[in-house]
Structure formats: structure tokens, C-alpha cells
């Protein structure tokens, strides 16, 4: 698995994506999320892949197992490197997602890695307990979902840096801990509640980090990406 910082292409459309990517003269690991995918469809994935970039397709599927199986079977044909579902969909749904990817991956190609979202990094413990009616601490909920994800034979989870070490202890070092909410020191948190710096995420046990506005909103995105990469790889 590519371990470069994952750049979140959280742009409204194709033009903005390629205006941003033209600044870079190296293969990147990028995230295509719901906003961009819903505007541009699967073609945006194909076009980004044609430029030589690895793609994390961040659609967070959460539906009945049969529907998720069929959706993943289709997504596997796009040649993405990493995809995800919501762990709250349950073990049968996660297993169906994995089966769909295996069924849809073209012969001779590597199946995309599959991970599950535990709790969104925008979710606070109070919000989880009052709105989701989960009578656990936030970390206990995340660890529960991580165990469930591992039982379903997925490759890892999306989590905040605050749970990464505990997940590694429970699920093993090879179990991916993909961490969004990454900011440079002094950067705004925006709508994320549980955030960290790249070097902080490394210390706390993240396997992969997802960086958005710290780079995409920078006056010099290439320089910002270099700083993020150096902090992450130090």
C-alpha cells in the first residue's frame, strides 16, 4: 500500500481538480469523496488514474448487503486502490462489500483494499451518546467497530489519531489505521473535531493520513504538501 499522505480532492468539479493537480509533477495518492464523485461520476476516477495517481474512493457505503455487494462489484472495475464502507452497516454488509470487490476486480488486477469508517472525526462523544444512543465512550465504540471490521476480514479502519494506537494493540500493526483531520500546526479545524498534525499522527500510530485544506487551500500547495510529507516521513 502506498503510504504517501493522501490528498483530499474536495473540489466541486473536474476543472478545479485538474487546476490543482497540474501543480504537481509526481504521482500522488488522492482521495475522491462524495462531493466530487456525485458531480462528475466515475469518469473523474478514470481521468485521475490516467494521470498515474493512486485513488482512495471515499464513498462510505452503508446499505443492505446485496446493494453494497453490487455497488462494490462496479467500483472494483474503476481500478481504485482503496475504498470504504461504514462499519455501522454490520458484519454481513462488510463481508458482502469484500465479496463484491473480489467479484468485480478484473483478472490479473489487484483488488482494492477495503476499510471501514468507525466514527466520523466530526462526531463528539456527547453527540454519539445522545444522537446515536451508544452507551459507550467514543474510544470504546471505535474499538468495537474496529474488532467487527477485522472479523469481517477487511484491511483496516478510518479513525482519528486518538484511537490509532489502541486499534493497533487490539487488531495488530498490519491492520490499517487511516486518519483524516490532519492539519499543520496553527491550521483551522473547520468541521473536524478530532484533529492532529502529520508528525503527531505518526507518533500516535496512524498508518495513513488524509490531508485536505492544509494543502488544497494553501497559497503554494506544492510547498504545503512537501511540509506535510516531510513531517509524516520524519
Swiss-Prot record:
EC numbers: 4.1.1.23
SUPFAM superfamilies xref list: Ribulose-phoshate binding barrel
Keywords, ordered alphabetically: Decarboxylase, Lyase, Pyrimidine biosynthesis
Pfam families (UniProt xref): OMPdecase (PF00215)
Protein's UniProt keywords contain Protein transport: no
GO cellular component: cytosol
Amino acids binding substrate: 10, 31, 58-67, 121, 183, 192, 212-213
Active site: 60 (proton donor)
Catalytic reaction equation(s): orotidine 5'-phosphate + H(+) = UMP + CO2
Any one GO molecular-function label of the UniProt entry: orotidine-5'-phosphate decarboxylase activity
Xref: InterPro entries: Aldolase_TIM (IPR013785), OMPdecase (IPR014732), OMPdecase_AS (IPR018089), OMPdecase_bac (IPR047596), OMPdeCOase_dom (IPR001754), RibuloseP-bd_barrel (IPR011060)
Single GO biological process annotation from the record: 'de novo' UMP biosynthetic process
Pathway: Pyrimidine metabolism; UMP biosynthesis via de novo pathway; UMP from orotate: step 2/2
Top EC class, one word: lyase
The family this protein is said to belong to: Belongs to the OMP decarboxylase family. Type 1 subfamily.
Assembly and oligomerization: Homodimer.
UniProt function note: Catalyzes the decarboxylation of orotidine 5'-monophosphate (OMP) to uridine 5'-monophosphate (UMP).
Protein's name in the database: Orotidine 5'-phosphate decarboxylase
Gene name for this UniProt entry: pyrF
Amino acid at each position: 500500500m502506498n503510504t504517501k499522505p493522501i490528498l483530499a480532492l474536495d473540489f466541486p468539479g473536474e476543472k478545479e481538480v485538474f487546476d490543482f493537480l497540474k501543480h504537481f509533477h509526481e504521482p500522488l495518492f488522492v482521495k475522491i469523496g462524495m462531493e466530487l464523485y456525485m458531480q462528475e461520476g466515475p469518469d473523474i476516477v478514470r481521468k485521475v488514474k490516467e494521470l498515474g495517481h493512486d485513488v482512495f474512493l471515499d464513498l462510505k457505503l452503508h446499505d443492505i448487503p446485496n446493494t453494497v455487494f453490487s455497488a462494490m462489484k462496479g467500483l472494483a472495475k474503476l481500478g481504485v486502490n482503496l475504498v470504504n464502507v461504514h462499519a455501522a452497516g454490520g458484519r454481513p454488509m462488510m463481508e458482502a462489500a469484500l465479496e463484491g470487490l473480489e467479484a468485480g476486480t478484473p483478472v490479473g488486477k489487484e483488488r482494492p483494499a477495503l476499510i471501514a469508517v468507525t466514527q466520523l472525526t466530526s462526531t463528539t462523544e456527547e453527540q454519539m451518546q445522545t444522537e446515536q444512543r451508544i452507551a459507550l465512550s467514543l474510544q470504546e465504540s471505535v474499538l468495537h467497530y474496529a474488532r467487527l471490521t477485522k472479523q469481517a476480514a477487511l484491511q483496516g479502519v478510518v479513525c482519528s489519531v486518538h484511537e490509532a494506537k489502541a486499534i493497533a494493540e487490539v487488531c495488530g500493526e498490519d491492520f490499517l489505521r487511516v486518519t483524516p483531520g490532519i492539519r499543520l500546526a496553527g491550521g483551522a479545524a473547520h468541521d473536524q473535531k478530532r484533529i492532529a498534525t502529520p508528525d503527531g499522527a505518526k507518533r500516535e500510530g496512524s498508518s495513513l493520513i488524509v490531508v485536505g485544506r492544509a494543502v488544497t487551500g494553501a497559497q503554494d500547495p506544492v510547498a504545503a504538501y512537501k511540509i506535510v510529507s516531510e513531517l509524516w516521513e520524519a
